[in-house]
Every structure is written in C-alpha cells, then in structure tokens.
C-alpha cells in the first residue's frame, strides 16, 4: 500500500521522532511506514489520519494487485 505520510509529515514541519511520540509508536515504525515496508493496523491508520486532520484515504492509497 502506498502512502503520503512522509510528504504530509514534512509539509507540517515534523521530524519522524516527533510524529512517533505523538502517536505512541517508535521512530522505526514511522520510517517503515514511509518506506512502504509496513502497512499500519487499522487503529494506527485512524490515529495518523486523526492527528493530521485528514481521512485515511488522503494518506494511504490502496492499490489492488493484478491477478496473473
């Protein structure tokens, strides 16, 4: 799943550490989310969206995989 987390975080002038602290997660979690190595739980996705005042869909972009 793609996301705009890094773009949104930087636009707000936040460091990964600051966002992680606000969401009660590790900086490594934020880094992994931004790099697309980790998909958030639904609870974390809601927390991120609420923190930024956006919808989940404005941050996370779901793309269906094409079947072979």
Residue ranges and their predicted role:
Residues 1-11:
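A short, Lys/Arg-rich alpha-helix, primarily the initiator
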Residues 14-29:
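Short alpha-helical DNA-recognition segment
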Residues 37-47, 65-66:
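Short, basic-rich loop-to-helix N-cap that marks the start of a DNA-contacting helix
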Residues 43-58:
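DNA major-groove recognition helix of helix-turn-helix/homeodomain DNA-binding modules
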Residues 60-68:
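Short, charged recognition helix plus adjacent turn
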């Amino acid at each position: 799943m793609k996301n705009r987390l890094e773009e949104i975080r930087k636009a707000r002038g936040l460091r990964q550490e600051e966002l992680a602290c606000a969401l009660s997660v590790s900086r490594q979690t934020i880094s992994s989310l931004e790099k697309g190595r980790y998909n958030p739980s639904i609870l974390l996705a809601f927390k991120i969206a609420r923190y930024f005042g956006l919808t989940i869909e404005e941050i996370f972009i779901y793309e269906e995989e094409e079947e072979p």
